[in-house]
């Protein structure tokens, strides 16, 4: 069975799915990725599916699982490079990929991850407002 | 071709003995109705090809156009009719190329002085030529159909231009009646352009669309969902009051899809979103 | 007439393991390209085939897929028959409901595949195995 390589680039993990994956390969990727997130402490994962000429419900479910598992491990996932024909087919299949962030290409994916991390910086406006609600003592 | 072996042999001989005179006369017969739209040299070459193919098929013992041994003859006829269809000749202008052989035979063969055998053979060959003519006609019709379908598709694509309005924003201004087939082409073109230009925003402007039905509304909706799966957002602009009523009456949920009155409003909206993204990043 | 790949003669893939599902996808893609299906239609058919081949393996306990190029006289198409001698499907309406699964899947394989093809026919009963025939026509 082939394994999909997981690359660390800067503070991101990049997965380029290149092969026509067997189901077992997809499951292995899910495990590998969880381990690598913990081992590297990365907070962002980009899954590039440019090379995939179909996404069926099994791969769709794998993508959703990866996104959920990553979130539990404090990492955001972005799926990038979905082909138009694949997207049209997924709509007809009825797969909504709920909870998965998507971007047109790797570059846009990186932007999206950068944005996603923003609100967690301590000086963020949202947090100030939240704290205000607990009374003047904290401000 | 509905001939006996002996007939086939005799007709092949008949066609072959005065080959040059026959093909010259045949070329004349074909050239007249085409009124110089093909050069004589070109016609002559086509007629000679056809003549050779017919004689060879008869010699090979092919008495039927569906016969394995007629493959070459069929190919010659197909090439001829496709060429004519592509060049814009009519069906009868195409068929005349084959029927010209009849005329030529009467010119070349001595009908009056001929014996009964020759007359019978001429009748038989007439049948053969009719078969060839019919086949040509059918092939021509098929080729025309194919051409028309191709042109329709090209028109469809011409009628749905996707334009890049701004860095990161493409727009598709739809004009005219949207049927299901065109809506599908639009959907694919738009999504492809998103990828090609790397634009995360698309404006679907339907100001020029007089009405939509359920299917078309569904197509637009699916386009928006597909674009989201790819990581892009669509904004729909120019929804006419009647169309808004139709959409609601049909019970189609546009949900959280951004809609704007005009293309300009939609562009402004997209630019604001792009600006917000940039600010968030540079903070 | 070399473009009529497999016209009339079915091509068979045995489905007994994970990698056979990949083989079904690849064969269907090749035949769909040869039959001149549009890219979107190819993608829809391959996706449907992937779903049904996986069901044949997972729920039917293995079986086969038979791919044939068909000609209606007006246009060409591709017909695929998935057959297994597994437990069959007792309640077909239920199995064809979006989201229904007995195997922890997304429950979109059967219902989604039906939406992705032009003709969908299913012959099954409890204890009698399952035979699904799908056809997609070139437009
Ligand atoms: N070939 C088959 N043999 C027996 N049961 C099947 C077969 N295919 C599908 N099923 C049943 O139909 C249900 C729905 O299938 P499907 O829509 O593909 O969803 P999923 O694969 O996610 O479970 C399956 O969970 C299974 O119970
Ligand atoms: Mg399934």
For the regions a language model picked out, list residue spans one by one:
Chain A
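STAS-typified acidic loop motif
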Residues: 2-30
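Short, conserved, surface-exposed binding loops centered on an aromatic residue
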Residues: 5-8, 35-39
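A short acidic, often aromatic-flanked loop/helix-cap motif at beta-alpha or helix-coil junctions
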Residues: 14, 108-111
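Short, solvent-exposed amphipathic alpha-helical segments in soluble enzyme
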Residues: 30-34, 64-65
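Catalytic cores of nucleotide-enabled group-transfer and carboxylate-activating enzymes in metabolic
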Residues: 37-40, 66, 111-116
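Amphipathic alpha-helical interaction surfaces in cytosolic regulatory modules
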Residues: 40-43, 47-96
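Short acidic-hydrophobic, aromatic-tinged amphipathic segments that line or gate anion-handling sites
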Residues: 99-109
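Intrinsically disordered or compositionally simple regulatory linkers and C-terminal tails
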Residues: 115-139
């Amino acid at each position: 069975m082939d394994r999909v390589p997981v690359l660390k680039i800067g503070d991101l993990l990049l997965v380029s799915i290149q092969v026509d994956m067997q189901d077992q390969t997809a499951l292995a990727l899910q495990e590998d990725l969880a381990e690598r997130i913990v081992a590297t402490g990365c907070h962002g994962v980009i899954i590039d599916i440019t090379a995939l000429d179909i996404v069926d419900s099994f791969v769709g479910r794998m993508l959703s699982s990866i996104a959920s598992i990553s979130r539990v491990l404090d990492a955001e996932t972005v799926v990038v490079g979905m082909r138009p024909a694949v997207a049209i087919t997924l709509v007809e299949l009825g797969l909504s990929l709920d909870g998965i962030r998507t971007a047109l290409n790797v570059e846009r994916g990186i932007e999206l991850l950068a944005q996603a991390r923003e609100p967690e910086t301590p000086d963020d406006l949202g947090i100030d407002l939240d704290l205000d609600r607990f009374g003047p003592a904290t401000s | 071709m509905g001939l006996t072996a002996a007939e086939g042999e005799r007709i092949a001989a008949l066609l072959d003995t005065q080959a040059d005179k026959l093909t010259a006369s045949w070329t004349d017969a074909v050239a007249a109705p085409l009124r110089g739209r093909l050069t004589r040299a070109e016609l002559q070459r086509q007629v000679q090809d056809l003549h050779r193919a017919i004689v060879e098929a008869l010699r090979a013992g092919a008495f039927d156009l569906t016969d394995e041994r007629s493959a070459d003859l069929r190919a010659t006829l197909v090439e001829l009719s496709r060429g004519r269809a592509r060049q814009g000749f009519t069906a009868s202008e195409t068929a005349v190329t084959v029927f010209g052989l009849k005329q030529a035979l009467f010119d070349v063969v001595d009908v009056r002085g001929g014996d009964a055998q020759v007359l019978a053979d001429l009748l038989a060959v007439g049948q053969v030529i009719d078969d060839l003519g019919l086949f040509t006609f059918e092939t021509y019709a098929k080729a025309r159909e194919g051409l028309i379908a191709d042109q329709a598709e090209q028109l469809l694509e011409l009628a749905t231009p996707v334009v890049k309005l701004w860095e990161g924003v493409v727009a598709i201004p739809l004009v005219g009646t949207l049927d299901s087939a065109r809506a599908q082409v639009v959907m694919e073109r738009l999504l492809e352009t998103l990828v090609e230009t790397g634009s995360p925003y698309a404006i679907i402007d339907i100001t020029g669309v007089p009405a939509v039905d359920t299917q078309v509304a569904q197509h637009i909706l699916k386009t928006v969902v597909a674009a989201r799966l790819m990581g892009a957002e669509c904004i729909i602009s120019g929804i006419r009051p009647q169309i808004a009523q139709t959409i609601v009456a049909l019970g189609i949920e546009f949900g959280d899809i951004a809609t704007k009155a005009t293309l300009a409003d939609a562009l402004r909206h997209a630019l604001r979103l792009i600006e917000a993204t940039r600010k968030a990043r540079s903070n | 007439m070399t473009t009529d790949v497999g016209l009339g003669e079915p091509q068979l893939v045995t489905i007994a393991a994970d990698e056979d599902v990949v083989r079904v996808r690849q064969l269907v893609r090749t035949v769909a390209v040869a039959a001149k299906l549009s890219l979107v239609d190819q993608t829809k058919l391959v996706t449907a085939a992937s779903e049904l081949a996986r069901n044949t393996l997972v729920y039917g306990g293995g079986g086969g897929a038979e791919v044939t190029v068909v000609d209606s006289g007006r246009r060409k198409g591709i017909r695929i028959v998935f057959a297994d001698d597994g437990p069959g499907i007792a309640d077909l309406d239920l199995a064809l409901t979006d989201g229904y699964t007995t195997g922890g899947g997304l429950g979109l394989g059967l219902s989604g595949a039906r939406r992705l093809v032009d003709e969908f026919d299913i012959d099954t009963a409890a204890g009698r195995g399952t035979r699904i025939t799908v056809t997609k026509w070139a437009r």
